[in-house]
Protein backbone atom coordinates (compact mmCIF):
# COMPACT_ATOMS: atom_id res chain seq x y z
CA UNK A 1 0.00 0.00 0.00
CA UNK A 2 1.32 3.42 -0.96
CA UNK A 3 1.07 6.13 1.65
CA UNK A 4 0.19 9.58 0.30
CA UNK A 5 2.21 12.27 2.06
CA UNK A 6 1.40 15.32 -0.01
CA UNK A 7 -0.41 16.95 -2.89
CA UNK A 8 1.57 18.51 -5.72
CA UNK A 9 -0.12 20.80 -8.24
CA UNK A 10 1.83 21.84 -11.32
CA UNK A 11 0.15 24.50 -13.45
CA UNK A 12 0.63 26.61 -16.54
CA UNK A 13 -1.48 29.76 -16.79
CA UNK A 14 -1.92 31.33 -20.24
CA UNK A 15 -3.13 34.78 -21.23
CA UNK A 16 -2.17 36.49 -17.96
CA UNK A 17 -1.93 40.29 -18.06
CA UNK A 18 1.74 41.25 -18.55
CA UNK A 19 1.25 44.23 -16.22
CA UNK A 20 0.32 41.83 -13.44
CA UNK A 21 3.34 39.55 -13.80
CA UNK A 22 6.18 41.82 -14.96
CA UNK A 23 7.31 43.19 -11.59
CA UNK A 24 8.46 41.42 -8.46
CA UNK A 25 6.34 43.59 -6.17
CA UNK A 26 3.09 42.48 -7.83
CA UNK A 27 4.03 38.81 -7.98
CA UNK A 28 5.29 38.79 -4.38
CA UNK A 29 2.08 40.42 -3.16
CA UNK A 30 -0.09 37.81 -4.90
CA UNK A 31 1.98 34.76 -3.89
CA UNK A 32 2.49 35.83 -0.28
CA UNK A 33 -1.18 36.77 -0.03
CA UNK A 34 -2.32 33.34 -1.23
CA UNK A 35 0.09 31.55 1.13
CA UNK A 36 -1.25 33.60 4.06
CA UNK A 37 -4.92 33.25 3.09
CA UNK A 38 -4.69 29.47 2.75
CA UNK A 39 -2.99 29.20 6.14
CA UNK A 40 0.31 27.74 4.99
CA UNK A 41 3.23 28.26 7.37
CA UNK A 42 5.76 30.50 5.61
CA UNK A 43 9.38 29.87 6.58
CA UNK A 44 10.97 32.27 4.09
CA UNK A 45 11.00 33.42 0.49
CA UNK A 46 13.29 34.52 -2.32
CA UNK A 47 12.22 36.43 -5.43
CA UNK A 48 14.30 37.39 -8.46
CA UNK A 49 13.37 40.26 -10.80
CA UNK A 50 14.57 39.73 -14.36
CA UNK A 51 15.48 42.55 -16.73
CA UNK A 52 13.56 43.88 -18.56
CA UNK A 53 10.71 41.92 -16.94
CA UNK A 54 9.68 38.60 -15.45
CA UNK A 55 9.94 37.10 -12.00
CA UNK A 56 10.95 33.86 -10.35
CA UNK A 57 10.04 33.23 -6.75
CA UNK A 58 9.92 30.47 -4.19
CA UNK A 59 8.22 30.42 -0.83
CA UNK A 60 9.46 27.80 1.58
CA UNK A 61 6.60 26.63 3.75
CA UNK A 62 6.84 24.15 6.60
CA UNK A 63 4.56 21.92 4.51
CA UNK A 64 6.92 22.12 1.45
CA UNK A 65 6.96 24.96 -1.14
CA UNK A 66 5.21 27.25 -3.60
CA UNK A 67 7.17 28.44 -6.64
CA UNK A 68 6.37 30.73 -9.55
CA UNK A 69 8.00 31.71 -12.83
CA UNK A 70 6.56 34.46 -15.04
CA UNK A 71 7.11 35.31 -18.70
CA UNK A 72 5.19 38.54 -19.38
CA UNK A 73 6.25 38.51 -23.04
CA UNK A 74 4.32 35.23 -23.43
CA UNK A 75 1.57 36.11 -20.90
CA UNK A 76 2.65 32.91 -19.10
CA UNK A 77 2.85 31.87 -15.45
CA UNK A 78 4.20 28.53 -14.25
CA UNK A 79 3.18 27.49 -10.73
CA UNK A 80 4.29 24.68 -8.48
CA UNK A 81 2.34 24.08 -5.26
CA UNK A 82 3.44 21.21 -3.03
CA UNK A 83 1.94 20.70 0.40
CA UNK A 84 2.34 17.86 2.84
CA UNK A 85 -0.55 17.50 5.22
CA UNK A 86 -4.00 18.80 4.29
CA UNK A 87 -4.40 18.27 0.51
CA UNK A 88 -7.25 20.80 0.43
CA UNK A 89 -4.78 23.61 1.11
CA UNK A 90 -2.97 22.97 -2.19
CA UNK A 91 -6.28 22.95 -4.06
CA UNK A 92 -7.47 26.12 -2.33
CA UNK A 93 -4.16 27.85 -3.14
CA UNK A 94 -4.51 26.86 -6.79
CA UNK A 95 -8.05 28.25 -6.99
CA UNK A 96 -6.90 31.52 -5.41
CA UNK A 97 -4.03 31.83 -7.89
CA UNK A 98 -6.54 31.40 -10.74
CA UNK A 99 -8.73 34.14 -9.22
CA UNK A 100 -5.80 36.52 -8.75
CA UNK A 101 -3.97 35.98 -12.05
CA UNK A 102 -7.16 35.66 -14.17
CA UNK A 103 -5.65 33.56 -16.98
CA UNK A 104 -7.56 33.17 -20.23
CA UNK A 105 -6.81 29.44 -19.98
CA UNK A 106 -4.72 27.04 -17.96
CA UNK A 107 -3.73 23.44 -17.59
CA UNK A 108 -2.72 21.71 -14.41
CA UNK A 109 -1.71 18.36 -13.05
CA UNK A 110 -2.44 17.05 -9.58
CA UNK A 111 -0.05 14.49 -8.16
CA UNK A 112 -0.55 12.65 -4.91
CA UNK A 113 2.99 12.18 -3.62
CA UNK A 114 3.99 9.19 -1.59
Model-based region annotation:
Residues 1-114:
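Polybasic/polar functional segments that serve as interface/processing modules
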Amino acid sequence: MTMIVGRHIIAELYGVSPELISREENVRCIVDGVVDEVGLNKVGSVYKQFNPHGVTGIVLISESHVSIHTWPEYELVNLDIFTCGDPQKAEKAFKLFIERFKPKSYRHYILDRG
